Amino acid sequence: MASNYVFSVLRSLLLLIHTVFLGQHHVSSATIIKSLPGFEGPLPFELETGYIGVGEEEEVQLFYYFIKSERNPKEDPLLLWLSGGPGCSSISGLLFENGPLAMKLDVYNGTLPSLVSTTYSWTKASSMIFLDQPVGAGFSYSRTQLLNKPSDSGEAKRIHEFLQKWLGKHQEFSSNPFYVGGDSYSGMVVPATVQEISKGNYECCNPPINLQGYVLGNPLTDFVYDYNSRIPFAHGMALISDELFESLKKTCKGDYRNVHPRNTECLKFIEEFNKCTNSICQRRIIDPFCETETPNCYIYRFLLAAYWANDETVRKALQIKKETIGEWVRCHYGIPYNYDIKSSIPYHMNNSINGYRSLIYSGDHDFEVPFLGTQAWIRSLNYSVIDDWRPWMIKDQIAGYTRTYANKMTFATIRGGGHTIEFKPEEASIMFQRWIKGQPL
């Protein structure tokens, strides 16, 4: 009995020392940013940037942007936001999606592009961490040659380690409700991260992270469901004919991804499908198709962001360490990466069993990860419905449709939305604020 008591006391002391150590030594740097090049005047919110080292020798330096809630940071939730890719910078979220800044869409004239405030930032209702991950994305870098390339499951562990160290330094947020969010390819990483945090709360880590749930937009979840939904989606959106759709169904048997080379009929009709859809904007089918970043094209803002993020005055203001990376790119698709999660459905199941809330939303004009695939894998969970399919409204207008399930999962569409939420920022912001407050959409 006595030895057990002594062991318990020693263990508690070690955990306390470990927590203090994390808070004092494991954050590589953190700086409050009062102003940014390209933005006129002081920033109307509190921005912090910094690096946190993860790994045995803290060889991986993850860069982050932290923005306090513009409402009540002492009590509002804390949301970690992960961009997709894998390899896309968190500037995608900060400047194009749900952050408080955006690129001013002027034609580039050789001077520094301008930034403007946004009206529908999710920081109106929560504090947010925008994280550059995996290593090589955005401004994150490695101090040494990595023995193992990043992976889906490995990123979940690194993100968990990042959060432990970040909260060790920002203990005033340790009791705030915590959520993980993301879109696109992060549909593979976010559910695994939630499970990793949950596991850590039970097994190893003190203090526990106050994890409440997660939010995902147009998430890649299961290659079979998501890829095979593209052809039914194209038919429903009048991108292909009835005859071609029926021929595809008959010859491919519903599997358009793993077609046997000898199934020449199926391959022939898939080629016809591609001819019909190759010049469609994948991100939102009603937008112009653009092969280059021209001023009249939506992706022109990506070019402006590259000019902005590669400017030396911007890097100095953000406290980017010199000579850690070369040219900043919005999405570094060439990162060596191990795609070791083929389906995140089991993670969704485990997270629901553990009682975590989830909001899964889809822009209904996204061709990259169509809402049909998302609906299909959600149905495969066999959750009972507690609030059946209905429109959700903003100012007496239909903003989308929603359904709520017994396991605290809410699915919603955003009418007219695309692959990411910047196409419908007001609708997305109102949807998020209602959900995060526990209100029905």
From Swiss-Prot:
GO terms for cellular component: extracellular region. GO terms for molecular function: serine-type carboxypeptidase activity. Residues 1-30 form the signal peptide. Glycans are attached at residues 109, 350, 382. InterPro entries: AB_hydrolase_fold, Peptidase_S10. The keyword Protease applies. Its EC number is 3.4.16.-. Belongs to the peptidase S10 family. Probable carboxypeptidase. This is Serine carboxypeptidase-like 3. The gene is SCPL3.
